[in-house]
Regions:
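Beta-strand-loop-alpha-helix segment that lines the small-molecule cofactor/substrate pocket
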Residues: 1-46
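Predominantly a Rossmann-like dinucleotide-binding segment in NAD(P)-dependent oxidoreductases
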Residues: 45-109
């Protein structure tokens, strides 16, 4: 659906998971650049007020340089086909694992 929208001149705000793998991500990002369109992932935790506070505290240096980070997130996943059926390109990592990974990436770059 990302490619369909981009090929029709539409900017894309995509729900996670953005793509299933890196090669797919590179492909749609290249298409967005070629078309000069915005393509981004709608990962809600990235835009929470606490994330802005965390970024501010870290950039101020008030707590020094972080050397270790623990991040986790969990909720009940039973009965959710996108998680339980691998052929749907889901699974726990793409569905919930991305949130703590995104947090770590935001903190450590």
């Amino acid at each position: 659906h990302i490619k369909l929208c981009l090929n029709h001149g539409k900017h894309v705000l995509c729900e996670k998971s953005f793509t299933v793998n890196e090669s797919q991500a590179r492909e749609v990002l290249a298409l967005a650049r070629e078309k000069k369109l915005l393509l981004t992932e709608a990962i809600w935790t990235r835009y929470m007020p606490m994330r802005k506070t965390l970024d501010s505290v870290l950039s101020s240096g008030v707590i020094g340089r972080p050397y270790m980070l623990t991040a986790n997130l969990g909720y009940i996943i039973s009965g959710k086909e996108r998680i339980m059926r691998p052929e749907l390109a889901g699974g726990a990592l793409l569905d919930v694992g991305i949130y703590p990974l995104n947090c770590v990436h935001g903190v450590r770059g």
